[in-house]
Amino acid sequence: MSYRELVVELAREHAEALSDALLELGALSVSVEDADADTPDEQPLFGEPGLVPERTAWQHSRVIALLSPDHEPAVLLAAAANEIGLDATPKFDVREVEEQDWVRLTQSQFEPIPIGERIWVVPSWHDAPDPDALVLELDPGLAFGTGSHPTTRLCMEWLEQSVQPGQSVLDYGCGSGILAILAKKCGANPVVGIDIDPQAVESARQNSERNRAEVTYGLPDACPAGEFDIVVANILSNPLKLMASMLASKVKPGGRIALSGVLARQADEVAAVYARYVDISVWREHEGWVCLAGTRRESH
């Protein structure tokens, strides 16, 4: 079976947002390169370990997305471009790629990730740097959420500070299950994870078993009735806006909600939609992304 690479060249200010949108919409992997590499205009690499980059992408960037055979490159790119607010779909090329052991190639790039005050996300082939910390064992896979993306990190930091033992938590758009697993390890009970992708649901179940975290997972139609003390949703801004009424209704009066997958420039628009139901504001910003957090107003 052959895969396809979608290759897009575009300006720096759109490269990271486009790569994130492509991942959310189903790309197997996405990388950003210097489109001027091996030319006189080539710029130094960014993001070397231990360094804080002065910019998030090269001036002239090349985004390369690996797609499964069932994805139509033009359709996926158009959806991603629309999601990040581009006026038109960028020009692109498509290359055929023979199947390789992508999992092993990807694993070689992952190291333990420290998050917040006491969290470590550790691949199974590594030992935890601090065994006494709050350790989540998680291997990269097709489901979104390894702790490396700013939105996942923001939600994890918020959960670490917010979850109290015995509180009920709903993770809507659970991906790999990383947020649901963390909530359980912070003492939440019960914890429910919901995703539209059956593969993500299965991945999340396996990750929970590996972490000995009892979480109930399912597709949207399996979402239990009733309200939760905490609802967290790390998805894209458009789905968040469309599901505002439903997500807010899952929060108990006085309960809390956290939303991410939202670019800083999208924060006001998303907050305005949720303001009908909850008192909400930007909790924290990181690398151009925000986590919105709020409290559902008490019923009268």
From Swiss-Prot:
Which cellular components does GO assign to this protein? cytosol
Location in or out of the cell: Cytoplasm
Q: Where does the protein principally reside?
A: cytoplasm
Q: What is its EC number?
A: 2.1.1.-
* NCBIfam families for the chain: prmA (TIGR00406)
**Per UniProt, which keywords does this protein have?**
Cytoplasm, Methyltransferase, S-adenosyl-L-methionine, Transferase
Record: residues binding S-adenosyl-L-methionine = T152, G173, D195, N234
Q: Which residues form a coiled coil?
A: none
Task: Please write the reaction equations for the catalytic activity of this protein.
Answer: L-lysyl-[protein] + 3 S-adenosyl-L-methionine = N(6),N(6),N(6)-trimethyl-L-lysyl-[protein] + 3 S-adenosyl-L-homocysteine + 3 H(+)
**Domain of life of the native organism:** Bacteria
Family in the record: Belongs to the methyltransferase superfamily. PrmA family.
What InterPro entries has UniProt attached to this entry? Answer: Ribosomal_L11_MeTrfase_PrmA, Ribosomal_PrmA_MeTrfase, SAM-dependent_MTases_sf
Q: Name one GO biological process term.
A: methylation
Annotated GO molecular function terms are: protein-lysine N-methyltransferase activity
Q: What is this protein called?
A: Ribosomal protein L11 methyltransferase
Purpose of the protein: Methylates ribosomal protein L11.
Species of provenance: Burkholderia multivorans (strain ATCC 17616 / 249)
